[in-house]
């Protein structure tokens, strides 16, 4: 398959590593929700846990992006996978909400570092005409991991009514995926930095604000915030929605895997489709479809109905994410692309901090299903940005 779509070797290696990393984090996060429920967490506390995942990345993303040129993209990826392996093992021993919150914050930083490394590698090593396609491959790998992780988690953790038999087994399986993510990175052990990133004497924050003033950059980053927040909230709140509607953890794992699978399918030939239809038009259609089917989830009260709505939403969300990656990269000169990627990720994490916390409050008052209506409203607001 890799040869048939003419994937460069470095992209193939990055795909293997990133898909394994995403399998790990996509397994860990639902297990965090289930572990919190085992410890008696309320819907509001579940929302706080989801928000804490993004809290420190909000502060660190710009700084980390500004320093990619000093350490190299490959080292970021290796560090992210290594710390994720150690944290996944640590999660299996946690039996307090406070420690669970601290570990959740740490896994958010670990994942961020790896993502900055991977996305910067693509943005600096790819010709402009290949950005849509190469980011599509990268996002394909992410979806593959997001599909495999919850499936394996549902099988390994087992089912005891609406909760897993063993969340610890789920966390240990996540550690295994993180270890797999490390193996292909030995190929990069002697790799040189692709492009030395620019040094802005006015400071990282000032440089980022200046970049946001570039025509189209602010709009692209807001769309990215809306899409990433929607995906993040689905991962965190589908387990809670499942417990409210008597879905087994395995059923929830399958539904999460379906979302990732349809996203993965939409990304295989993204480059060719974007060239034919145009990136802007394709992004607009994907946001509209995401809005409609996130709202449809509110009315789904069986695993099959929810699975159908999630599948179509996943297909649409899967298109939007990589298109915002390539758009942000195109709007920045090569020497500033790491900072542009980090500005986008900062916005994503702001959304992933604010939206889950708000969703937790909504779920506590009106049930987890109402969260999906909130996501639809957020996505709808980005439609006007894309026009």
What are these regions (language model features)?
Residues 1-8, 190-221:
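Juxtamembrane intracellular "pre-TM" segments in multi-pass secondary transporters
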Residues 8-54, 219, 223, 228-241, ...:
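Helix-loop boundary and gating motifs at the non-cytosolic
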Residues 25, 106-118, 312-324:
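Core transmembrane helices of Major Facilitator Superfamily
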Residues 54-62, 146-147, 260-268, 352-353:
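Residue-level signature of mid-helix packing/kink "hotspots" within the transmembrane helices
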Residues 60-72, 266-278, 363:
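Helix-to-loop junctions at the C-terminal end of transmembrane segments
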Residues 75-89, 281-295:
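Structural signature of the two symmetry-related core transmembrane helices
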Residues 105-142, 327:
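Cytoplasmic helix-loop-helix junction between adjacent transmembrane helices
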Residues 175-196, 385-387:
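C-terminal membrane-cytosol helix-exit motif in multi-pass small-molecule transporters
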């Amino acid at each position: 398959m890799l040869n048939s779509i003419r994937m460069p070797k470095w992209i193939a290696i990055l795909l293997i590593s990133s898909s394994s990393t995403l399998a790990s984090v996509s397994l860990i996060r639902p297990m965090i929700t289930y572990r919190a429920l085992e410890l008696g967490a309320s819907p509001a506390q579940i929302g706080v846990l989801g928000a804490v995942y993004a809290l420190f990345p909000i502060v660190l993303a710009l700084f980390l992006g500004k320093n990619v040129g000093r350490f190299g993209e490959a080292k970021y990826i290796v560090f992210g996978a290594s710390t994720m392996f150690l944290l996944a093992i640590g999660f299996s021993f946690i039996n307090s909400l406070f420690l669970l919150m601290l570990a959740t914050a740490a896994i958010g930083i670990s994942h961020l570092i790896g993502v900055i490394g991977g996305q910067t590698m693509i943005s600096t090593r790819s010709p402009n005409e290949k950005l849509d396609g190469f980011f599509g491959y990268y996002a394909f790998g992410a979806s593959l991991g997001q599909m495999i992780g919850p499936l394996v988690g549902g099988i390994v953790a087992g089912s005891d009514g609406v909760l897993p038999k063993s969340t610890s087994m789920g966390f240990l399986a996540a550690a295994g995926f993180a270890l797999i993510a490390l193996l292909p990175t030995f190929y990069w052990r002697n790799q040189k930095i692709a492009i030395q990133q620019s040094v802005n004497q006015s400071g990282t924050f000032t440089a980022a604000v200046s970049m946001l003033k570039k025509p189209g950059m602010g709009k692209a980053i807001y769309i990215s915030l809306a899409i990433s927040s929607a995906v993040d909230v689905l991962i965190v709140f589908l387990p809670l929605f499942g417990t409210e509607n008597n879905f087994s953890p395995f059923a929830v794992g399958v539904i999460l895997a379906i979302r990732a699978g349809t996203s993965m399918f939409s990304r295989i030939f993204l480059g060719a489709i974007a060239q034919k239809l145009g990136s802007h038009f394709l992004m607009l259609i994907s946001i509209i479809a995401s809005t409609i089917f996130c709202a449809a989830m509110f009315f789904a009260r069986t695993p099959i109905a929810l699975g159908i709505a999630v599948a179509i939403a996943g297909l649409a969300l899967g298109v939007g994410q990589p298109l915002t990656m390539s758009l942000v990269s195109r709007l920045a000169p090569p020497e500033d692309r790491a900072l542009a990627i980090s500005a986008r990720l900062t916005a994503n994490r702001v959304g992933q901090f604010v939206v889950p916390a708000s969703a937790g409050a909504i779920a506590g008052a009106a049930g987890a299903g109402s969260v999906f209506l909130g996501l639809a409203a957020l996505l709808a607001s980005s439609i006007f940005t894309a026009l």
